[in-house]
Amino acid sequence: MESNGGGGGSPKEAAVVVPSSGDATLGGHLARRLVQVGVSDVFAVPGDFNLTLLDHLIAEPGLRVVGCCNELNAGYAADGYARARGVGACAVTFTVGGLSVLNAIGGAYSENLPLICIVGGPNSNDYGTNRILHHTIGLPDFSQELRCFQPLTCYQAVVNNLDDAHDQIDRAISTAIRESKPVYISVSCNLPAVPHPTFSRDPVPYFLSPRLSNQASLHAALDATLAFLDKAVKPVLVAGPKLRVAKAGGAFVDLADASGYAVAAMPSAKGLVPETLPRFIGTYWGAVSTAFCAEIVESADAYLFAGPIFNDYSSVGYSCLLKKEKAVVVQPDRVTVGNGPAFGCVMMRDFLSELAKRVRKNTTAFDNYKRIFVPEGQLPECEAGEALRVNVLFKHIQRMIGGAEIGAVMAETGDSWFNCQKLRLPEGCGYEFQMQYGSIGWSVGALLGYAQAVQKRVVACIGDGSFQVTAQDVSTMLRCGQRSIIFLINNGGYTIEVEIHDGPYNVIKNWDYVGLVNAIHNGEGRCWATRVRCEEELEAAIATATGDKADSLCFIEVVAHKDDTSKELLEWGSRVSAANSRPPNPQ
């Protein structure tokens, strides 16, 4: 990481930097292209190889450079921004910055997010000279960083020649949007200010032609699916996380309305479909599903999964009671019907839209759900001053998001996954977490990026262990004037790891978290931090955060017992532990 990692001007009041060599420069072209695809904030850490490029990014009127405290958080911020805006970008320096941001790029790749990672590279004259440069591993071959990025990006552009720079940049950015994956752009440090005829002042706007379904394949898939679903007695509909990639959320809602099926969402699809749908029955997550949801899904004689990802986490250690012969699996460009045929070149949005027009309405599964459903009981009342329980915390968070203008809820890897899944999201409230990659600390940077992209406040639930990984970019939230509400759950360690496999390594040093945030605040910007230990203090803190301090970044440290976990985490942890502990197959 660069020693000057906290550098860069305030993103709200960045000094105007005039490019040194006219308008038709590489740096100016890259900046305009970013704005054109919807990026207005680039999350950056300055280093000597990217400084001139940052000058040109800052000079673009529609672009802000948000200086982050480290490259990992810059990458996480671009991840969060992409979730809200559809595309995100970060800028770092060569190798020391690139390898630091790489973990975040891996997370964005796994979550199918278009993220443009820009790296300031060596001077173009140094390529092929056998020179050894700083910020390298001491070899004259500068390709080590590129080779690290290749498995984690869908396109890589090494721009060290102006003649093909325009084409490489345009192709990289368009590929990120089209494939919904990260891309890597390395720009030699001596090129951003150099004019070239290919960098016109107003580049031709991007036009990405939509992927079209093969009509014969589409109709064959529809016929097979309708025959499969219409003969079922109690079919159900389940949303998966690839609805985002396919941009098929609206088509899924149309199908839910037309079919009458009971509707569930996989955990990583929470927030992608409205939970206000009339036949929504909750989260399907195997043994840790919303009450009565798994019973309805797993007992169905047919289920349509739209954009699922089945891994060891989403299947609770491969323990879901699903059968392939009962499933229609719709992926962004493919449909598979039971044990029968698979239909390629079928776009999910087209398929779901057409299916909604032809499907036969069947409310049997939802009718069964209504018969067996028993409302959850009331939480026991807390005694005055009684130590705060985590379930009481989330009772109050549920009330808060229902009554305040909250744009999204973000859940950090850990018990917050399970507690936040139980929140019933109001109309228009998003939900984000990183289930496939599961990198602890992700939510701090992602919160920074997401909040920078939206107008409404964002709520984040973060465990103490995760917060210690990436805490310093609370500083950047303050510099950006953000108003998020952070609930820091202090239970003394890595609780999710404890429930998978306990050991002394899961205990962490306790911090004075409120004191830390106040030190970061240092009287600059709007920030309010408090610690709560009982329900009365929590109620007062939420009232203040949504009232007098509604224009501030609010940090509420919630002190909880180390063994206060959700029952879902206990169940999930034991099943994932069993999956991890399988003995080697006989050789």
From Swiss-Prot:
Cofactor binding, note field: Binds 1 metal ion per subunit.
GO molecular function: magnesium ion binding; pyruvate decarboxylase activity; thiamine pyrophosphate binding
Class in the EC hierarchy, top level: lyase
Superkingdom classification of source: Eukaryota
Residues annotated for substrate binding in this entry: D48, H135, E497
GO terms under biological process: aromatic amino acid family catabolic process to alcohol via Ehrlich pathway
Reactions that this protein is recorded to catalyse: a 2-oxocarboxylate + H(+) = an aldehyde + CO2
Amino-acid positions noted as binding Mg(2+) in the UniProt annotation, renumbered to this chain: D464, N491, G493
Cofactor: a metal cation; thiamine diphosphate
A GO CC term assigned to this protein in UniProt: cytosol
UniProt region (Thiamine pyrophosphate binding), positions on chain: 415-496
Keyword set, alphabetical order: Decarboxylase, Lyase, Magnesium, Metal-binding, Thiamine pyrophosphate
EC number: 4.1.1.1
UniProt subunit comment: Homotetramer.
Family: Belongs to the TPP enzyme family.
Protein's name in the database: Pyruvate decarboxylase 3
Organism: Oryza sativa subsp. indica
Gene label: PDC3
